[in-house]
């Protein structure tokens, strides 16, 4: 009997080892990993540059607290601001913590309380980020949520215009909703959101927890659009599997986040910073990012060609290497079949298969497309769905 709370619907796969794009279970079966730790292992498993950086830091010091100046924090912060619209960084341990920090900063700076977010969004499971999340299933059973969070339909310009006022502290969104089904924001809607924030003195917060750190072929996904957020949040891929989160903000916000306003015991931990520094050194290389964009286009084209004739496939969409296959009904019965064929994928909402490779080769993309085509063809023929 497990001593763990049953908070996860775990797969029947026990991992023995992982390296690059391959996961090996305790029975010796190997899987091509298109889950990537849920958009965490952006450089694959145990990338040698990241592993070397961690090992070097382990031989120096592990933790001293944020009462000290920690040089490697400054190095990672400099990398983040050099590749984003931000000027200052607050380090924490997860995406939820980064989003909590963003929400606190928005309220503190503006003196306002209302925050606009969007249906099917996902921002975390703490009380503030749960309230920000636009999914009822995340709210269920927890009683009254924190007030003043407004959930609007994504890409509905009229609804956003009606909701905006001088009482709104921030608009918070993902440019591609990951947990919400790999749903991209409309560029015109994002531009309108940015303009409305400027007009009303609200902050634009872009949650890049899943879309950031090279996932879409840019350092951050908002950089595909003509907007500049006031606050950016990052986590997941930032540490290549070592827990780390970051909130990145513009210079005018600095005075609102002074000593004692917020903090994190483990935020900016030297081991996490070593992982983040090495990760960013690889991911922010222009050649790496260009390769992600090219492979993303290749992957989408292959999926469109292979799946276009299948009735059960409603849509194939994505940005860079954040890709979703939307099916007509629930995809849960399909996941074990795909796994049995040696490909690890996961869902995004009830009817989307989510694919999150990053350092894969075109040959591995071809292999994955063949497996997906085979399973979806069989499902299409036998009406498994």
UniProtKB/Swiss-Prot annotation:
Catalytic reaction annotation: N(2)-acetyl-L-ornithine + 2-oxoglutarate = N-acetyl-L-glutamate 5-semialdehyde + L-glutamate
Positions that bind pyridoxal 5'-phosphate: 95-96, 122, 207-210, 265
Annotated positions binding N(2)-acetyl-L-ornithine: 125, 264
Alphabetical list of CDD domains matching this protein: OAT_like
Main location: cytoplasm
Cofactor note: Binds 1 pyridoxal phosphate per subunit.
PTM-bearing positions, type N6-(pyridoxal phosphate)lysine: 236
Pfam family, one: Aminotran_3
UniProt-listed Enzyme Commission number(s): 2.6.1.11
Compartment(s): Cytoplasm
Any one of the GO CC terms: cytoplasm
GO MF: identical protein binding; N2-acetyl-L-ornithine:2-oxoglutarate 5-aminotransferase activity; pyridoxal phosphate binding
Superkingdom field: Bacteria
Cofactor: pyridoxal 5'-phosphate
Quaternary structure, from the entry: Homodimer.
NCBIfam families: argD (TIGR00707), PRK01278.1 (NF002325), PRK02936.1 (NF002797)
Family per similarity comment: Belongs to the class-III pyridoxal-phosphate-dependent aminotransferase family. ArgD subfamily.
Protein name from the UniProt record: Acetylornithine aminotransferase
Species this protein is from: Geobacillus stearothermophilus
